[in-house]
């Protein structure tokens, strides 16, 4: 059976920054760098000299996201064409780990090596959330237009929303009404999300997906509004396992070839200078390094990526907050770990995913109490989804998998909200929209999703309430 994919990004495993990850030891000395966005990040790659295996290990961690992205692209749809997810998962789904019940995905690989590519997002009813997260090939979120922040430089604010993704160094002229979206690499990935309000809403979302347009700039100019046809979803491949199966020579040769197409950022120059001693450069080759050294570096690097734990992770009232994803600077360890656990990590301003790890004990009934005015602060919407220990949705006769989004929660007379968390169907005194089923026995997790969270959620001024026994 092929391993399951993760539902928040398009990745492999279930517990992103979950409890139980091993502590991570930095690669020798620690250097600090400043990302192109201006934020300071801790580097996981030392610029000090070292033996060949140590340097190659650092290079593996550095290049892992690039190689993983390329393998994922290779097994995806053709470039500059959308592929759409069309269904909401249920407990019978055993493909996606930690799937969400809130959005449908529309994905497209971009190839800008010939010319810019135009994306048009259709107009839709007010209040429907959408996000067109666009990552460079190093998994940094390079652009993130959304319904909350459409980032238009021109055109109608109510849609359609028309953007042109520009390759590095492009200085041509765009037609009026198209917002430029420069990208740092000539290949990139759009991971689009569109809000869906339950099964009955699927036809409306399918129509929106069908209204997404993507085309090379020259084709768009010749026939405005026309786009490349959507692609059939390709067979699922486990890119993480494919990369894990590469020997040292295969991995580093591929990394060097890819860096010639999608170059690293200027801030990476110190690390690249160190790797150059082994021939690991854009378009280069590590051919002079013994195969056993490269194979050992791959094994060491794989262990470092798998066992990474970011010291910036936070636990608030029992809820685990991962460190900010999507913009990594020179924190190469975090970048590689997030890529392995699930490509498509959001920027905090687009989504937060506090996660609670629990176990059923006592009478098996728990409660989440939101004080008046203290529901999750968002500019879009929020939800809480329950998962079994294996990360899949929990079977229950009512087919209830989440609360907060598809049905409005009921408030108490004082304006507070109580969510009842238990396996048994609640009494009539509890609103159906306020019940979240969990397993009868054993471990479970809750993931709270905040779409377009407000600043108070991002800086932790607002804190989620603790899960308590009833």
How does the language model describe each region?
Residues 12, 19, 33, 49-52, ...:
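Generic alpha-helix initiation/capping and coil-helix boundary signal
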Residues 19-21, 26, 31, 56-59, ...:
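Small-side-chain structural scaffolding
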Residues 29, 43-44:
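Compositionally biased non-globular segments, especially hydrophobic aliphatic-rich helices
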């Amino acid at each position: 059976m092929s391993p399951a994919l993760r539902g928040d990004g398009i990745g492999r495993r279930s517990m992103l920054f979950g409890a139980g990850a091993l502590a991570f030891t930095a690669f020798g000395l620690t250097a600090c760098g400043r990302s192109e966005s201006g934020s300071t990040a801790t580097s996981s790659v030392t610029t000090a000299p070292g033996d060949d295996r140590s340097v190659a290990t650092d290079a593996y961690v550095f290049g892992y996201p690039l190689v993983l992205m390329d393998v994922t692209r290779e097994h995806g749809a053709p470039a500059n064409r959308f592929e759409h997810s069309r269904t909401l998962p249920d407990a019978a789904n055993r493909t996606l780990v930690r799937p969400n019940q809130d959005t449908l995905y529309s994905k497209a690989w971009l190839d800008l090596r010939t010319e810019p590519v135009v994306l048009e997002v259709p107009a839709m009813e007010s209040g429907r959330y959408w996000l067109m997260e666009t990552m460079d090939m190093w998994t940094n979120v390079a652009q993130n237009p959304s319904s909350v922040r459409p980032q238009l430089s021109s055109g109608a604010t109510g849609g359609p929303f028309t953007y042109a993704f520009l390759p590095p160094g492009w200085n041509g002229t765009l037609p009026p009404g198209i917002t430029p979206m420069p990208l740092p690499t000539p290949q990139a990935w759009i991971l689009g999300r569109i809000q869906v309000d339950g099964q009955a809403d699927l036809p409306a979302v399918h129509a929106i997906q069908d209204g997404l347009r993507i085309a090379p700039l020259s084709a768009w100019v010749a026939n405005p509004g026309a786009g490349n046809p959507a692609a059939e979803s390709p067979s699922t491949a486990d890119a993480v396992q494919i990369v894990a199966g590469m020997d040292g020579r295969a991995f580093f040769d591929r990394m060097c070839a890819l860096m010639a197409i999608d170059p690293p950022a200027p801030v990476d120059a110190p690390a690249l200078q160190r790797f150059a001693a082994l021939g690991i450069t854009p378009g280069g080759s590590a051919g002079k390094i013994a195969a056993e050294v490269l194979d050992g570096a791959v094994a060491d690097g794989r262990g470092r990526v798998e066992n990474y734990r970011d010291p910036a992770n936070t636990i608030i009232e029992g809820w685990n907050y991962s460190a900010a994803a999507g913009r990594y600077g020179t924190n190469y360890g975090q970048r590689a770990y997030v890529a392995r656990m699930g490509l498509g990590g959001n920027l905090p301003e687009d989504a937060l995913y506090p996660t609670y790890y629990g176990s059923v004990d006592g009478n098996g009934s728990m409660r989440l109490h939101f004080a008046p005015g203290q529901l999750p602060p968002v500019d879009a919407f929020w939800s809480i989804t329950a998962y079994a220990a294996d990360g899949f949705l929990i079977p229950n006769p009512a087919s209830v998998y989440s609360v907060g989004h598809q049905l409005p929660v009921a408030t108490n007379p004082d304006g507070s909200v109580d969510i009842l968390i238990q396996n048994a169907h609640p009494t009539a005194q509890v609103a159906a929209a306020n019940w979240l089923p969990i397993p009868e026995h054993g471990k479970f997790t809750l993931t709270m999703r905040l779409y377009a969270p407000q600043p108070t959620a991002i800086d932790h001024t607002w804190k989620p309430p603790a899960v308590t026994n009833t």
